[in-house]
């Protein structure tokens, strides 16, 4: 099994990505196992931030690194919280605080104007100076609920309505979420690209 470092300190992402990546024969090691320091996400886009994180993890560990930068884009809020999704309510905000701030911002907004999507960018760097990192996108369309539902998932999952299953993301079984999610779609794209490269 190939080892790969996951460049995130978010335990929810570590669990989800380890599960997804194991399907493709990768052993996922969290960067915390190597005492990799958090790096400042100074980019202005998901791609820039993912590259910053992947390069830093590869540099510190000497292993290939995969980084995901993702967030929730709410149309009524002109794409916010976007790259600031994890710190929407402040630098050290909890998932609950971010969720409550978003619900407050969307209070009174009619259902038709509550459209949103999760957007994930995944970057795989084979080494710190990889000149051609693999970059993949995944999007998951839905809308913002008026209150939280469900116990599964993390982040904004309890208020993200999934039209395909008529429930909140946090009410989905993990296997179903894997099929639908932005992260699952980005990973499928990543492995399609990896397979194409190894076949050449």
From Swiss-Prot:
It comes from Vibrio parahaemolyticus serotype O3:K6 (strain RIMD 2210633). Pyrophosphatase that catalyzes the hydrolysis of nucleoside triphosphates to their monophosphate derivatives, with a high preference for the non-canonical purine nucleotides XTP (xanthosine triphosphate), dITP (deoxyinosine triphosphate) and ITP. Seems to function as a house-cleaning enzyme that removes non-canonical purine nucleotides from the nucleotide pool, thus preventing their incorporation into DNA/RNA and avoiding chromosomal lesions. Pfam families: Ham1p_like. This is dITP/XTP pyrophosphatase. Belongs to the HAM1 NTPase family. It catalyses: XTP + H2O = XMP + diphosphate + H(+); dITP + H2O = dIMP + diphosphate + H(+); ITP + H2O = IMP + diphosphate + H(+). GO terms for biological process: nucleotide metabolic process; purine nucleoside triphosphate catabolic process. Keywords: Hydrolase, Magnesium, Metal-binding, Nucleotide metabolism, Nucleotide-binding.
């Amino acid at each position: 099994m190939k080892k790969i470092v996951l460049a995130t300190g978010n335990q929810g992402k570590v669990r989800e990505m380890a599960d997804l990546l194991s399907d493709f024969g990768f052993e996922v090691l969290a960067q915390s196992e190597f005492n990799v320091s958090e790096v400042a996400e100074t980019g202005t886009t998901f791609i820039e931030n993912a590259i910053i994180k992947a390069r830093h993890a590869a540099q510190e560990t000497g292993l290939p690194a995969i980084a995901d930068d993702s967030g929730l884009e709410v149309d009524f809020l002109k794409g916010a919280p976007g790259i600031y999704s994890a710190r929407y309510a402040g630098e050290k905000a909890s998932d609950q605080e971010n969720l409550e701030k978003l619900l407050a911002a969307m209070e009174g907004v009619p259902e038709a104007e509550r459209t949103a999507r999760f957007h994930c960018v995944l970057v795989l760097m084979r080494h710190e100076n990889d000149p051609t990192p693999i970059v993949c996108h995944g999007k998951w369309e839905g809308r913002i609920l008026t209150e939280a539902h469900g116990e599964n998932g993390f982040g904004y999952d309890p208020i993200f309505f999934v039209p395909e299953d008529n429930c909140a993301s946090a009410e989905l079984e993990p296997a179903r979420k894997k099929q639908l999610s932005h992260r699952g779609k980005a990973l499928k794209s990543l492995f399609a690209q990896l397979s194409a490269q190894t076949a050449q």
